[in-house]
Amino acid sequence: MATTYSNFSENSPDIVLNVGNTFGIDADFEVPAFAEPNEYVPEIDSTYCFDKNTTLAILAGFSDNRRVMVQGLHGSGKSTHIEQVAARLNWPCVRINLDSHISRLDLLGKDAITLEKDKQVTKFQEGILPWAIQNPTALVFDEYDAGRPLSLIHI
């Protein structure tokens, strides 16, 4: 079944937060954030402890629109770290599990048949990548090493 993502492109970060105060690490600079969360913002885990170097790398991605790769052993908390940074910034975050059967069509989009006024109509339904380009979103590509080459080429 196709997933429909709602657009919120009129939103952009509208506040700045002090990194030291927000993440409890020794850093004195500000990072853009959203005043209010939306449906794509992860829940805050108030017990989460941030690793300084990893947090600073992730924050560089949020503040400077950079791509960040976090690597580590399976189950070491890479995706959770990104989600917890996003949660404190009220920044939308979507996790894509690449070890599942995700296809090029899921990533880029496809024609879908819908009903309009009791008639079948074919409409293009965007995939997650075009949607994310149009909306301020952190995409987390989980299990990247297990991704199928025909899907990874589009990322």
Identify what each model region corresponds to.
Residues A2-I153:
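AAA+ P-loop NTPase catalytic core and its hallmark functional loops
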